[in-house]
Each structure stands twice: as C-alpha cells, then as structure tokens.
Regions:
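Edge beta-strand at a domain terminus
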Residues: 116-130
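Sec/Tat signal peptide C-region and signal peptidase I cleavage site
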Residues: 19-25
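Bacterial N-terminal signal peptides that target proteins for export
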Residues: 2-11
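Central antiparallel beta-sheet cores of small beta-barrel/beta-sandwich binding domains
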Residues: 28-99
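Predominantly extracellular/luminal cell-surface or secreted proteins
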Residues: 55-57, 114, 129
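C-terminal structural segments of small proteins and small subunits
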Residues: 99-103, 107-114, 118
Length: 130
C-alpha cells in the first residue's frame, strides 16, 4: 500500500515536470512575424530539432534577398527554461552564425543571431500570427 502511494506521487511529479517542457516545445512551432511584420517565418520540426523557413516577405525584403523558402533558423534544440540554441542565417547580408530563441510567452519569442564569434549580434521580437 505504501509502495503504491509512493509510485502514484512519483508519477504525478513526473507528469507535472514534463508537461511544461512538452507545452513549450510544441508552442515553438507555428508562423512568426518580425516586429515590422515584413517577414513571416514558419517554425517546424526538422528531425530532432526545429528550423525556421521564410514563408512570406514584403516586396522590399524580397528585393534585398529575403525570399520565401530560405531557411533562416536551423538545428534549434532545447537549452532549458524556454530557450533554444542553434544556427541563424541573415539572407540580406548572407551571414550565418549562432542563434538563441527564447520564448517569453505563448505568442512572443526573442530571436537573437550572432556572427563573427559573437562580435556582431542582432535581436528581434517575433509574434505568433494565426
């Protein structure tokens, strides 16, 4: 009887601990717009990680090289506390570097890309669009 109570409590704790992790990883998937709403990126599973591909760009951004179908985030893997780390690509400048994506709410994430050994970084606030 005591063993059954212990196992039940352990199961409840494990479910409580794993539920937020599952919810946050699923929440990363979707369509996200930059602050100017000039680019929309679709984030989805890519094997054992996440990636982000441009699904729409304004005419101005397309002229500058930001074209739909371009992968701008890759190999994003959980790093804890709603943070994902991977790679970023900036198509306007043709630069790749490290990426950190931090979910600050169900519909808001901060995307930071750094290049040249972390010397040059750019951070943007993206919002989920339905």
């Amino acid at each position: 009887m005591i063993m059954k109570r212990i196992l039940t409590k352990l199961a409840v704790v494990l479910i409580a601990v794993s539920a937020p992790a599952m919810a946050s990883s699923q929440a990363l998937e979707g369509r996200w717009a930059n602050a100017k709403r000039s680019v929309i990126v679709k984030v989805s599973r890519c094997g054992d990680a996440y990636c982000g591909t441009i699904s729409w760009a304004s005419a101005h951004n397309r002229e500058k090289g930001t074209t739909p179908g371009t992968r701008v985030l890759s190999d994003l893997k959980p790093a804890g506390d709603g943070v994902y780390k991977g790679r970023a690509f900036e198509p306007k400048r043709d630069i790749s570097g490290s990426a950190t994506v931090r979910q600050v709410g169900p519909d808001v994430m901060i995307v930071k890309g750094c290049a040249v050994m972390g010397l040059f970084c750019k951070e943007q606030r993206w919002t989920r669009i339905s």
